[in-house]
Amino acid sequence: MAKRKLTQNQTRRIQSNNAKTLHRHKKKDIEWSDEMLGESQEGVVVTRYSIHADVENEQGEIYRCNLRRTLSSLVVGDKVVWRKGNEQLQGVSGVIEAIHPRENEISRPDYYDGLKPIAANIDRIIIVSAVLPTLSLNIIDRYLVVCEIAGITPLIVLNKVDLLAQEQRQEIEDQLKIYQDIGYEILMISAKSGENMEKLTALLAQGTAIFVGQSGVGKSSLINHILPSVNAQVGDVSETSGLGQHTTTSSRLYHLPQGGNLIDSPGIREFGLWHLDAEQITKGYREFQYVLGTCKFRDCKHLSDPGCALREAVEQGKISPVRYDNYHRLIESLSETKSQRHFSLV
């Protein structure tokens, strides 16, 4: 009798269980006894791999470390307590023993495990978009919701503006004005021509920043311009799908010559928000806050409800109709994505 064909979800679950089994097996390979380790010291996680992490000590030296099994999830930017080994074991030089409380973190939805943290202790999120494959205000709004909820300052960067004719550039600037009007900072740059790159590096010097955005928007090109010695692999936009080809495999923290730190993380084709509810997404729109709670009905859905203060603010020109429409698209997508819990990672 022919075997019944597995569904896509069953195949994914089998692959996930297999990967977790291999992960547990590998963790047993290296066991550190207390006498093999030196004194505790402070460090920062600069790269996170599946079962190891690279930690930078206070002298700027980087060591590959194992993780204590009692630790919760570890991400780039985490401040940790670790101990250096007296010798290397299978290329590992020490053990991370504790994680300091995080000032903040950003996470993305994970198909199997709910939320998966990406990075921690961030001062600014650089939302990189581009004129190719297309400028998506909906994607920008998704990232801004995350910034508002996490309490992290965003910077909207439009890359590859050298590809625009003057008329096209004016049209893009008009589209982005809705963000400037509510206090978001916009920077139009070109890694190729160098336009406004000095302004970007000056902003990056003000703390720890992370680049986010779809693949193909030029994040790796920007890093190559800011840090030529890194030589991050650059990916092209697929002619077939219009989506960027993945170039970064692990999140990594870089120190910038002019000061500050930059975290580069793997590209995400679709930044899912299914882990949020409608109330959280509403709080992610900063210009909505002054009218929330003033609607006629407490359970107002902010659509055709009578006495909706939010809709009235849109009609009066106080709130952008584009942002208002994007907001409802995000709300409508919640039930769909929560039932499927499916998004595409590069």
From Swiss-Prot:
Binding annotation for Zn(2+): C295, C300, H302, C308
Name the record gives this protein: Small ribosomal subunit biogenesis GTPase RsgA
Annotated localization: Cytoplasm
InterPro entries in the cross-refs: G_CP_dom (IPR030378), NA-bd_OB-fold (IPR012340), P-loop_NTPase (IPR027417), Ribosome_biogen_GTPase_RsgA (IPR004881), RsgA_GTPase_dom (IPR010914)
Gene name per UniProt: rsgA
Cofactor note: Binds 1 zinc ion per subunit.
Gene Ontology process terms (BP): ribosomal small subunit biogenesis
Main location: cytoplasm
CDD domains xrefs: YjeQ_EngC
Location of region: Disordered: 1-26
Polar residues bias spans: 7-20
Binding site for GTP: N159, K160, V161, D162, G213, Q214, S215, G216, V217, G218, K219, S220, S221
The species this protein was found in: Haemophilus influenzae (strain PittEE)
Gene3D superfamilies: Nucleic acid-binding proteins, P-loop containing nucleotide triphosphate hydrolases, Probable gtpase engc, domain 3
SUPFAM superfamilies: P-loop containing nucleoside triphosphate hydrolases
